[in-house]
């Protein structure tokens, strides 16, 4: 009788220990492929200070802070590493994108056709300490986007709106599955024949893309690429 009870106690103890171990693993389990953003407090402080001091100086061709934060969050959340920006302007959105990439270990290619804006952007990237994460090119995006080899996992389009669909179709084959194509100044309420409306209608029709529009700032379409069925 004593031996039988001892076996029961051993079985009970083992079961209880197993349950505790499994519960602990379920609470503290971290996926093997996940990576925490790289910490760089000095760079973070430098970027925040620059963005704060420059907040009232950006031209209309730059994104508002809320949209910059949105782009940053998308990159961090998905651990993107290879980004393309079409339309650098003077560097506001590029700073947000490169700041995120500095944490994921990635790099940004950004394109602008205007020499003045390009030079100003280069200076802003230097001031903020993000130059090593940015490959800024003075070029015609109509041509260069086609020539870039990729692959990319994040794209932000903020150049000539009538060319949005063309930019998308040129870069789409180079966008990884799970990657994200974003475009600025997009609204669900904007119909008609504008470049933004034509682009949005087209990308929403694609079965291997999931597209939403964030209207909090200047309006950003967010299109995630899914595996083709």
Enumerate the predicted regions with their spans.
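A short alpha-helical cap/connector motif
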Residues: 2-19, 29-154, 161-229
């Amino acid at each position: 009788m004593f031996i039988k009870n001892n076996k029961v106690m051993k079985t009970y103890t083992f079961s209880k220990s197993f349950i505790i171990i499994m519960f602990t693993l379920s609470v503290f389990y971290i996926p093997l492929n996940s990576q925490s953003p790289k910490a760089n407090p000095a760079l973070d402080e430098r970027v925040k200070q620059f963005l704060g001091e420059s907040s009232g100086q950006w031209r209309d061709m730059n994104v508002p802070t809320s949209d910059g934060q949105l782009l940053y969050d998308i990159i961090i959340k998905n651990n993107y590493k290879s980004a393309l920006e079409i339309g650098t302007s003077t560097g506001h959105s590029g700073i947000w994108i490169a700041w995120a990439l500095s944490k994921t270990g990635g790099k940004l290619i950004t394109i602008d056709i205007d020499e003045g804006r390009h030079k100003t952007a280069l200076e802003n990237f230097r001031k903020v300490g993000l130059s090593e994460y940015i490959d800024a090119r003075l070029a015609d995006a109509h041509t260069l986007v086609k020539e870039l080899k990729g692959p990319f996992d994040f794209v932000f389009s903020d150049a000539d709106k009538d060319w949005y669909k063309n930019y998308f179709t040129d870069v789409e084959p180079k966008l990884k599955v799970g990657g994200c194509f974003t475009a600025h100044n997009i609204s669900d309420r904007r119909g008609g024949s504008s470049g933004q409306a034509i682009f949005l209608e087209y990308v929403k029709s694609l079965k291997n893309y999931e597209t939403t529009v964030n209207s909090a700032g200047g309006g950003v379409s967010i299109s995630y690429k899914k595996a083709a069925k």
